């Protein structure tokens, strides 16, 4: 929204979409906030979390977070998983991305495996209210996603055995 007049419209400028104020002509070049969403697997289990101190905290989530300056997406995956649930991961696989329009976020979806046998979750209680390993079978029986968000899609793919590690195993 224009800081001068409080209005905005989306227009094309030199082949790019920008925000422009129809009153004063002020042009705003929105920035993109890259982030990751991470499906951490451990055999037939998927790590699910719930956000703390946020509206909708009852909803199921995957580990997620923003990429920091000079950090690769893969480094973000390792850092966010360690910060939020205290686990090391390996075998990262890029899945796909999902833009979140007005907020300027773009989420890069990744699959990864737990590195090692210690699956003890150490929650960052500031960001998360809960974290648990949920079996593929339990997800098949009980999970109903919204069908829109990348989180929902990745959980459904895991439940159906279409995550990259299950597909490798079944070749």
Where are these regions (language model features)?
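Short, cysteine/histidine-rich loop/knuckle motifs that typically chelate Zn2+
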Residues: 1-4, 22-23
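Hydrophobic alpha-helical positions that pack around
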Residues: 63, 77, 81
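Accessory, usually C-terminal, subdomains that scaffold auxiliary metal cofactors
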Residues: 57, 83, 96-97, 117, ...
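Nudix hydrolase/Nudix homology domain
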Residues: 9-14, 55-60, 124-171
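Glycine-rich phosphate/ribose-binding loops and adjacent secondary-structure elements
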Residues: 69-73
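N-terminal strand-loop-strand
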Residues: 16-62, 66-67, 88-89, 93, ...
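Cys/His-rich microdomains that often coordinate metals
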Residues: 4-9, 28
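Active-site-adjacent beta-strand/loop module that shapes the phosphate/pyrophosphate-binding cleft
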Residues: 98-122
């Amino acid at each position: 929204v224009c800081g001068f007049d409080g209005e905005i419209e989306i227009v094309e400028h030199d082949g790019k979409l920008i925000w422009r104020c129809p009153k004063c002509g002020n042009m705003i070049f929105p920035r993109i906030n890259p982030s990751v969403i991470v499906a951490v697997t451990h055999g037939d289990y998927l790590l699910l979390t719930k956000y703390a101190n946020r509206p909708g905290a009852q909803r199921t989530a995957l580990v997620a977070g923003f990429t920091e300056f000079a950090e690769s997406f893969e480094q973000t995956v390792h850092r966010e998983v360690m910060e939020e649930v205290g686990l090391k991961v390996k075998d990262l696989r890029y899945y796909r991305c999902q833009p979140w329009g007005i907020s300027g976020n773009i989420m890069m979806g990744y699959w990864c495996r737990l590195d090692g046998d210690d699956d003890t979750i150490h929650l960052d209680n500031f960001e998360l209210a809960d974290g648990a390993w949920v079996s593929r079978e339990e997800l098949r029986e009980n999970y109903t996603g919204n069908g829109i968000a990348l989180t929902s899609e990745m959980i459904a793919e895991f439940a159906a055995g279409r995550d990259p590690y299950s597909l490798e195993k079944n070749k």
